[in-house]
């Protein structure tokens, strides 16, 4: 028996040492390995190259079998740099796919694609591992009931509600609040649903991954004093990694999330940033394996690869994985095969607006651009649906009137339009909300607003009952009662000033 070399530290399953081969060819991150007749590894088996380079430095490279070439050769993709490898080096077939640590011990830790901790906090204290390749849950295991996943964030719950076990696309440029929104969702799922989160950094900037980790520590999402009380596990395969690592890191994160769903029976949030990089890495690997490219140079297996990842993200009778995926749209072309294939799997889109961020309205979720398949009367109920539609109509009318206001001013509008504008401005401000994770920056205590409270608040604004209140009373508050109290305080303050 020997330790599984695909992961490190405690809690690694042991595998019988299987077959040995030799490197026959190296093409960048791709290796051809020759095995003795009848000793060929299976597709997706993990191979390990151990030895020393010409300078005497130790080498330990893990690869994944992608093709069986014939003549007792296989083609494998490396999960780390192939620097220093030479022909003839010994390769060990572990006899199983890549396996990664799973369970509560992963919370608060950072892992690479192989499930190795990279945060210098020592080995992971778990004996449970799981292979990253597995079938999607069977139809009989799926929970087909449509239910809303309440986030406690007003703009999301009212206008673009998330489906429990659904997939949400998160669109937004740099600096509009993606990270803070992600951290608030991680915080709220832990408090309201007793759930945990897994963050998969797929092919994005290492600096951003580091910033996210530091901000999570600062806001308490990761508890440095008691790491077991952390609410999130982080898995990174960043831009500088070989394409094999970037292609598989999403599966590593998903495998950790599946354990929380299937064994711990929890509601899990899975973040993937960025799903486009998963496709991009697959395209690079496909070219290295010599496959004929398809439309726009993408891999011919694009839909299959995307489907095998997305179909595992679902609700079962045990628990749910709700996935929020940042989507990069190359050259803003929504018809590009990568985003187009992603859209087919999404249940909702949350679009962050730079214009709203510039106004200081956070979360800067665009209420008119964000959509959800869940916003139907038979799913959310007539009251929720009617309120959401009226809010959108009011905001749309305000948007149409903005050019007239900019040129002629408010006084030139009809009485009805002036009332619409006043209510729309109150709605716009009431869609903002103080976040728990931003408390350390803003000094304002965070607020979790239940769906029923959210609907009641917007109904009161639309009914005209609050027309006499100043619009600043609705800015950065939780429920409508707080807005009313703030309006009273503002009135008292203005009287005292007089």
From Swiss-Prot:
* Chain sites annotated for binding ATP: 172-179
The chemistry this enzyme catalyses reads: ATP + H2O + 4 H(+)(in) = ADP + phosphate + 5 H(+)(out)
Its main localization is plastid
InterPro entries from the UniProt entry: AAA+_ATPase, ATP-synt_VA_C, ATP_synth_F1_bsu, ATPase_a/bsu_AS, ATPase_alpha/beta_chains, ATPase_F1/V1/A1_a/bsu_N, ATPase_F1/V1/A1_a/bsu_N_sf, ATPase_F1/V1/A1_a/bsu_nucl-bd
Q: State the source organism's domain of life.
A: Eukaryota
Q: Which Pfam families match?
A: ATP-synt_ab, ATP-synt_ab_N, ATP-synt_VA_C
Keywords for the protein's UniProt record, in alphabetical order: ATP synthesis, ATP-binding, CF(1), Chloroplast, Hydrogen ion transport, Ion transport, Membrane, Nucleotide-binding, Plastid, Thylakoid, Translocase, Transport
Q: Which residues form a coiled coil?
A: none
For this record, an example GO cellular component is:
mitochondrion
**Membrane topology designation:** Peripheral membrane protein
A Gene Ontology BP annotation from the UniProt entry: proton motive force-driven mitochondrial ATP synthesis
- List the Gene Ontology MF annotations in alphabetical order: ATP binding; ATP hydrolysis activity; proton-transporting ATP synthase activity, rotational mechanism
The EC number(s) given in the record are 7.1.2.2
Q: Where in the cell is it found?
A: Plastid, Chloroplast thylakoid membrane
CDD domains of this UniProt entry? ATP-synt_F1_beta_C, ATP-synt_F1_beta_N, F1-ATPase_beta_CD
Family recorded in the similarity comment: Belongs to the ATPase alpha/beta chains family.
Its subunit composition reads: F-type ATPases have 2 components, CF(1) - the catalytic core - and CF(0) - the membrane proton channel. CF(1) has five subunits: alpha(3), beta(3), gamma(1), delta(1), epsilon(1). CF(0) has four main subunits: a(1), b(1), b'(1) and c(9-12).
What does it do? Produces ATP from ADP in the presence of a proton gradient across the membrane. The catalytic sites are hosted primarily by the beta subunits.
Protein's name according to its UniProt entry: ATP synthase subunit beta, chloroplastic
């Amino acid at each position: 028996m020997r330790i599984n070399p695909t992961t490190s530290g405690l809690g690694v399953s042991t595998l019988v040492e299987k077959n040995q081969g030799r490197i026959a060819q190296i093409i960048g991150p791709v290796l051809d390995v020759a095995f003795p007749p009848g000793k060929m590894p299976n597709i997706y088996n993990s191979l390990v190259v151990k030895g020393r380079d010409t300078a005497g430095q130790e080498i330990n490279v893990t690869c994944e079998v992608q093709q069986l070439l014939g003549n007792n050769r296989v083609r494998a993709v490396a999960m780390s740099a192939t620097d220093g490898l030479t022909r003839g080096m010994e390769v060990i077939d572990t006899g199983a796919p890549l396996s990664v640590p799973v369970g509560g011990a992963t919370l608060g830790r950072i892992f690479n694609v192989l499930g190795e901790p990279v945060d210098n906090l020592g080995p992971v204290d778990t004996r449970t591992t799981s292979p990253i390749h597995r079938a999607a849950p069977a139809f009989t295991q799926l929970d087909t009931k449509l239910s809303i996943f309440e986030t406690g964030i007003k703009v999301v719950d009212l206008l673009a509600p998330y489906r429990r076990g659904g997939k949400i696309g998160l669109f937004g440029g740099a600096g509009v609040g993606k990270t803070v929104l992600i951290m608030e969702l991680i915080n709220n799922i832990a408090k309201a649903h007793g759930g945990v989160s897994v963050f998969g950094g797929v092919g994005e900037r290492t600096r951003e991954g580091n910033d996210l980790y530091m901000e999570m520590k600062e806001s308490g999402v990761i508890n440095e004093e008691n790491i077991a009380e952390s609410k999130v596990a982080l898995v990174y395969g960043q831009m500088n990694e070989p394409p094999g690592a970037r292609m598989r890191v999403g599966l590593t994160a998903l495998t950790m999330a599946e354990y929380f769903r299937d064994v711990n029976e929890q509601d899990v949030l899975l973040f993937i940033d960025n799903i486009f990089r998963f496709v991009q890495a697959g395209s690079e690997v496909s070219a290295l394996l010599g496959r004929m490219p398809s439309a726009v140079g993408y891999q011919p297996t694009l839909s299959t690869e995307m489907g095998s990842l997305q179909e595992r993200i679902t609700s079962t009778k045990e628990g749910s994985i709700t996935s929020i995926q940042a989507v990069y749209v190359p050259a803003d072309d929504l018809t590009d095969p990568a985003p187009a294939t992603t859209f087919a799997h999404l249940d909702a889109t949350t679009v962050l607006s730079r214009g709203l961020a510039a106004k200081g309205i956070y979360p800067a979720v665009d209420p008119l651009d964000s959509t959800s398949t869940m916003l139907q009367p038979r799913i959310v109920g007539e009251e929720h649906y009617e309120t959401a539609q009226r809010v959108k109509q009011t905001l749309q009318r305000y948007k149409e009137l903005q050019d007239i206001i900019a040129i002629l001013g408010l006084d030139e509008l009809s009485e009805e339009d002036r009332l619409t504008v006043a209510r729309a401005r109150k709605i716009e401000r009431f869609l903002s909300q103080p976040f728990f994770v931003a408390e350390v920056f803003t000094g304002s205590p965070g607020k979790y607003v239940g769906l029923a409270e959210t609907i009641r608040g917007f109904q009161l604004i639309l009914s005209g009952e609050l027309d006499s209140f100043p619009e600043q009373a609705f800015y950065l508050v939780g429920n409508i009662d707080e807005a009313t109290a703030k309006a009273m305080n503002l009135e008292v303050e203005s009287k005292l000033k007089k």
